[in-house]
Amino acid sequence: MKNELEFAKKLIDFIYDSPSPFHSVDNIKNTLIENGFAEIKEENKWELNKNGKYFVKRNDSALIAFTVGSGFVAKKGFKIIGGHTDSPTFRIKPNPEMVSENSYIKLNTEVYGGPILSTWFDRPLSIAGRVTVRGKSALFPETKLLNIKRPILVIPNLAIHMNRDVNSGFKINPQVDTLPIIGIINDKFEKENYLMKIIASELGEDIENIIDFDLFLYEYDKGCIMGINNEFISSSRLDDMEMVHAGLNALVNAKCSEATNVLACFDNEEIGSATKQGADSQFLSDILERIVLSFGGDREDFFRALHNSFMISSDSAHAVHPNKGEKADPITRPHINEGPVIKISAAQKYTSDSNSIAVYEEVCRLSGVPYQKFVNRSDERGGSTIGPITATHTAIRTVDIGTPLLAMHSIRELCGTLDHMYVEKSFEEFYNL
């Protein structure tokens, strides 16, 4: 249990230091550099080496890392693990300051993804993301990371005495009910550029140099290990940072194989992936083709490589809920700490089929990791993942898997300490094949 707890603590630290997709990618980048990976850029000509370790960023919120295999890539292909860096939250709108009751100052926000809104009330919140400032060229402004590392916001509940329906299905209006308060002002003129002044102070920038921002709310409190036997991890953003963390650790710990090992961390999965940095873009296929071209291959070699490749699409899965067991399939019922979950859908919301399932089952068998399966109830629609999207773009055989989770899309999700270690172990075995 000691190893599992140590690894779980590292996950909690990783998530706490990754309050936005931009910070997630920055932390991934730092870990990769510490382990001998070199950054390459899409705008440059690539000169890659066999057994070399590289990574590419896009939009500062998505990243693809890879270790070049020793074999001919057209024959040996790619072994890919994919996840995403974003989580449900609230994005801060432009000119967000709003004054209420001539006293409170609130921020105007927009829902990002599908959070369980009620879980965001009455919690210490903060702000993190990316700020764009003037650069040397109008075409190429500079960007800076911002993380206000203290609790500065709260979304207060309405007292039950004024909202008697709060415990019986109260409908939350995100334009009214979930706007966070940031403080109290004494003068209406204090409202002007209130947030911009905070940003400028945090970054040490002149306010005139700040052009725009991509800023989001996050829960300030750190995750923890809990349960009478330390069997649970409770944290924000387990979906999908736990899978990214497992994939990252597997990539840096794996031996160099004949195939090229790839870790793809996409942004914007929670809003459909249809962005230049999302899974529904050419990001992955562009990088894979450029790897082939860098070693003298042509487009036919690229298609051959795709045919000889395999991908694990890794996104959190649903565990059976202890209080709502009837919401799960009557037969297929994943439990926390009983291993990673293979996700299956007749409608191909998950891209797993018998061939790709067999591959991952063998990976688990070779690594000594238990596994489970998940299907939705036949009267529940369920969600989807990056798996069907990337498979559509690349035609790579793909399996959808994930760590079983409770309270998915809550501000505070719950998974198992054993499961996180299980997933990493299976990923490392996959990369070592």
UniProtKB/Swiss-Prot annotation:
SUPFAM superfamilies reported in the protein's UniProt record: Aminopeptidase/glucanase lid domain (SSF101821), Zn-dependent exopeptidases (SSF53187)
One term under GO cellular component: cytoplasm
EC class (word): hydrolase
Binding, Zn(2+): 84, 161, 409
Catalytic activity, EC: 3.4.11.-
Top-rank taxon: Bacteria
NCBIfam families: PRK02813.1
Family (UniProt): Belongs to the peptidase M18 family.
Protein name per its UniProtKB record: Probable M18 family aminopeptidase 2
Taxonomic classification: Bacteria, Bacillati, Bacillota, Clostridia, Eubacteriales
This protein's encoding gene: apeB
